[in-house]
């Protein structure tokens, strides 16, 4: 009997030792799996971040391309205004007037090709117009409508280059 008890104790000790040995191996495996999962998450985040950076860079490039002519258009607009004023002067010969109109039309066409267009001047919109004066409303010009335009406004695609300077009826 004592041999059986000793054998049982030895078997129990061996099983206990095996359990102790299995636990560290299993925890090392778990740690390795956790680290692998952590690295995979970091990789996925870094990959997503790179995609976001590329997307933002593409959007920025497209925006720059779309509005590349903004500065030039702002510099040309005063010349266009001067041509319009010159055409309003009385006493111009037909040849001079026709020449000025041709220059004006070519400038307007060049600006249109770049996406520059005149701001509508029907109903007053504080986002597009600058009210420099108000006048009482009449039958011809109801309230919140533009009675007179002092300077035309322009926008490049949906971006305002210059607000129209207007007289608004109230």
UniProtKB/Swiss-Prot annotation:
Domain of life: Bacteria
Subcellular location: Cytoplasm
Gene Ontology CC terms: cytoplasm
Molecular function terms, GO-annotated: adenyl-nucleotide exchange factor activity; protein homodimerization activity; protein-folding chaperone binding; unfolded protein binding
Keywords: Chaperone, Cytoplasm, Stress response
Major location (coarse): cytoplasm
Matching SUPFAM superfamilies: Coiled-coil domain of nucleotide exchange factor GrpE, Head domain of nucleotide exchange factor GrpE
Record field: compositional bias (Acidic residues): 10-22
Record carries keyword Repeat: no
Region (Disordered): 1-29
GO biological process: protein folding
Pfam families membership: GrpE (PF01025)
Subunit: Homodimer.
Stated role: Participates actively in the response to hyperosmotic and heat shock by preventing the aggregation of stress-denatured proteins, in association with DnaK and GrpE. It is the nucleotide exchange factor for DnaK and may function as a thermosensor. Unfolded proteins bind initially to DnaJ; upon interaction with the DnaJ-bound protein, DnaK hydrolyzes its bound ATP, resulting in the formation of a stable complex. GrpE releases ADP from DnaK; ATP binding to DnaK triggers the release of the substrate protein, thus completing the reaction cycle.
Similarity section: Belongs to the GrpE family.
Name listed for the protein in its UniProt record: Protein GrpE
């Amino acid at each position: 009997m004592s041999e059986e008890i000793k054998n049982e104790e030895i078997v129990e000790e061996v099983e206990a030792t095996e359990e102790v040995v299995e636990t560290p191996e299993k925890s090392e495996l778990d740690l390795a799996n956790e680290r692998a999962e952590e690295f995979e998450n970091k990789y996925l985040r870094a990959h997503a971040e790179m995609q976001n950076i590329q997307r933002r860079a593409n959007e920025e490039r497209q925006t720059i391309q779309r509005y590349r002519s903004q500065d030039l258009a702002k510099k040309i607009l005063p010349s266009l205004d001067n041509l319009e004023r010159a055409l309003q002067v009385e006493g111009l010969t037909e040849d001079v007037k026709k020449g000025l109109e041709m220059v004006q039309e070519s400038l307007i066409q060049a600006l249109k090709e770049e996406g520059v267009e005149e701001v509508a001047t029907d109903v007053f919109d504080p986002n597009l117009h600058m009210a420099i004066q108000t006048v009482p409303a009449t039958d011809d010009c109801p309230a919140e409508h533009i009675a007179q335009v002092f300077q035309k406004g322009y926008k490049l695609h949906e971006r305002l280059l210059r607000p129209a300077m207007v007289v608004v009826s109230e």
